[in-house]
């Protein structure tokens, strides 16, 4: 395998990412502004209610209380919806970064196995020439060394609490001119796709030629599909789980551990107490 060809392909794969990320971050910024405006709105309504109580006492009925409370609840629901959309966009960015780092890692392994690239450990021992490794690549290689259970189960860094695995394979048609490729972000700008369809198109467009996400995950040992959640256990055997396999219907709040990791942590806790 020619290293220059791998480099050219990698650069081609990531060439559209800056525009995609810029668009998604701009959308997050706009949603932040909407959230702030909605917060001001419902805080103003709450202020009216508190002012009435101060002036008339808590026992006096406010004729506008039901109307004001309904407006407060509506604004809070809109804020919650916007926050969820922001999380989806952030998860999309993190997922794409992780995906390309994983591909870069696999290319490094391939070159090392072909003898075209010295292993990372040998380079560090032979001298201070780290030109091949940026801090990101170095951390990726370390992750590979730590978690290389098998080639069928490459570990993805825990970049999000959960992610939508609608990244079905569709060709980027690499022979075409880059200018002719219409990005999912530009499609959404035209208003033809909602957020969910945008994510589906974004993930779909990545990997028909790469065929790199046929790995098996979860207790069920099936490929990724639907919603998936990452276990926060540092030594989790599977790391990613389908919602249905762990009885989840929505993203968990805070830290989440799979049943196996919970059991292992419980055993360690009992040993410490003894």
Curated annotation (Swiss-Prot):
Residues 166-180 have a biased composition (Basic and acidic residues). Signal peptide: none annotated. Transmembrane segments: none annotated. One of its GO terms (biological process) is meiotic cell cycle. Zn(2+) 2 binds at residues 231, 236, 258, 261. Keywords: Cell cycle, Chromatin regulator, DNA damage, DNA repair, Meiosis, Metal-binding, Nucleus, Zinc, Zinc-finger. A zinc finger (PHD-type) spans 215-264. The record marks 217, 228, 232, 240 as: Histone H3K4me3 binding. Residues 121-194 are annotated as: Disordered. The keyword Zinc-finger applies. Pfam families: ING (PF12998), PHD (PF00628). InterPro entries: ING_fam (IPR028651), ING_N_histone-binding (IPR024610), Zinc_finger_PHD-type_CS (IPR019786), Znf_FYVE_PHD (IPR011011), Znf_PHD (IPR001965), Znf_PHD-finger (IPR019787), Znf_RING/FYVE/PHD (IPR013083). One of its GO terms (cellular component) is cytosol. One of its GO terms (molecular function) is histone acetyltransferase activity. It is found in: Nucleus. The PHD-type zinc finger mediates the binding to H3K4me3. Component of the NuA4 histone acetyltransferase complex which is involved in transcriptional activation of selected genes principally by acetylation of nucleosomal histone H4 and H2A. The NuA4 complex is also involved in DNA repair. Involved in cell cycle progression and meiosis. PANTHER family: CHROMATIN MODIFICATION-RELATED PROTEIN YNG2, INHIBITOR OF GROWTH PROTEIN. Interacts with H3K4me3 and to a lesser extent with H3K4me2. Component of the NuA4 histone acetyltransferase complex. This is Chromatin modification-related protein YNG2. It comes from Candida glabrata (strain ATCC 2001 / BCRC 20586 / JCM 3761 / NBRC 0622 / NRRL Y-65 / CBS 138).
């Amino acid at each position: 395998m020619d290293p220059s060809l791998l480099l050219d392909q990698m650069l081609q794969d990531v060439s559209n990412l800056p525009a995609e990320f810029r668009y998604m971050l701009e959308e997050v910024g706009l949603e932040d502004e909407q959230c702030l405006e909605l917060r001001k709105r419902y805080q103003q309504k709450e202020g009216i209610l508190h002012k009435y109580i101060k002036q008339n006492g808590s026992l006096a009925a406010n004729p506008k209380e039901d109307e004001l409370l309904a407006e407060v609840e509506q604004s809070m629901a809109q804020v919650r919806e916007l926050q969820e959309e922001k999380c989806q966009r952030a998860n999309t960015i993190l997922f794409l970064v992780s995906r390309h780092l994983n591909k870069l890692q696999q290319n490094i392994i391939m070159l090392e196995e072909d003898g075209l690239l010295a292993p990372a450990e040998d380079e560090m021992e032979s001298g201070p020439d780290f030109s091949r490794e940026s801090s990101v690549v170095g951390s990726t290689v370390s992750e590979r060394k730590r978690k290389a259970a098998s080639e069928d189960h490459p570990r993805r860094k825990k970049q999000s609490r959960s992610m939508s695995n609608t990244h079905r394979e569709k060709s980027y048609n690499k022979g075409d001119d880059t200018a002719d490729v219409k990005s999912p972000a530009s499609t959404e700008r035209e208003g033809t796709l909602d957020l969910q369809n945008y994510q589906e198109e974004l993930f779909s467009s990545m990997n028909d030629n790469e065929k790199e996400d046929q790995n098996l995950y979860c207790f069920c040992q099936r490929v990724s599909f639907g919603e998936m959640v990452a276990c926060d256990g540092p030594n989790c055997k599977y790391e990613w789980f389908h919602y249905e396999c762990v009885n989840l219907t929505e993203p968990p709040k805070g830290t989440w551990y799979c049943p196996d990791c919970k059991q292992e942590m419980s055993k360690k806790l009992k040993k410490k107490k003894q």
